[in-house]
């Protein structure tokens, strides 16, 4: 039998209600099974986030029609109540509209962060409270542990390849008190083994891959429908001012992109900046991608001292500027205009406005999440065209 994780709750299980956010996948289904088998008063909730009829033919997308059916079948197997909540309008406003607006303005969004910050945690926690639940549990791969001062902290997952802490940096300290992530200390193989032990019909269901509301990964289709100006063609301009060609619309490009530029040059060129107001995509050599400092906005801080103190002390941190990158050493500071900034010990490439700059206390596999913010601006290591020529 597979070892069971610590469910980390207070009180008698039978009198403790736990709402489990059930996407219809194996991870959240196992979470529901863990709490149900331990004797908790479990209520399964699945969010209808968009017109699932349009997406029902697709595999690999969260909460499409098949996923809602799968979640209900898991709940039936476990003998727990299950509700489907229509969150479509708030999901469109908080996630899809922001996603399209970001691409139209030349920045690269992370819709999963917006969804976790708003629909899944802010709104679903409120719904859990209305249902009389003490906790909301999800199938995210991130660890939540009690801190010495009684608060809770977030840590990278035991299985590094599955770690989702980057996407959960905006989770607030208050939310952490009521959130539980039992899979953070587990490995995926053990989760699937538990699904089989519990007799769950989704034990062999493939993992989701795409952004849930993007058919087949074609995000441009979504953006163009909502913000057609993002598909307007414009100039591809070298950092030295030369116009090298035409682009297909700013929504097709992101910082660090090399493929798909459609221009022939003797040296490889990369997207360095996107000026949506001028409908320009600016390109240059790889050396121009290296960034030494980042300013951030909408900061969520989970550290032990106030964020203002951490800035004043220029606290050492480790940062991830993309979910697939390892944490790198940096320190906090204030930019000349007073906004929070992160100074990198070594230049990082592909730092894109709109993406997340996520802070940790070290670079290890068990690092604690200290928070993060949205990237506003990036200061390149090379200050002039001559330096990268």
Curated annotation (Swiss-Prot):
Q: Where in the cell is it found?
A: Cytoplasm
The set of disulfide-linked cysteines is: 115-212
Q: Is Nucleotide-binding one of the keywords UniProt gives this record?
A: yes
The secretion signal range is none
Q: Which family does it belong to?
A: Belongs to the MnmA/TRMU family.
Q: What does this protein do?
A: Catalyzes the 2-thiolation of uridine at the wobble position (U34) of tRNA, leading to the formation of s(2)U34.
Q: What is this protein called?
A: tRNA-specific 2-thiouridylase MnmA
**This protein's encoding gene:** mnmA
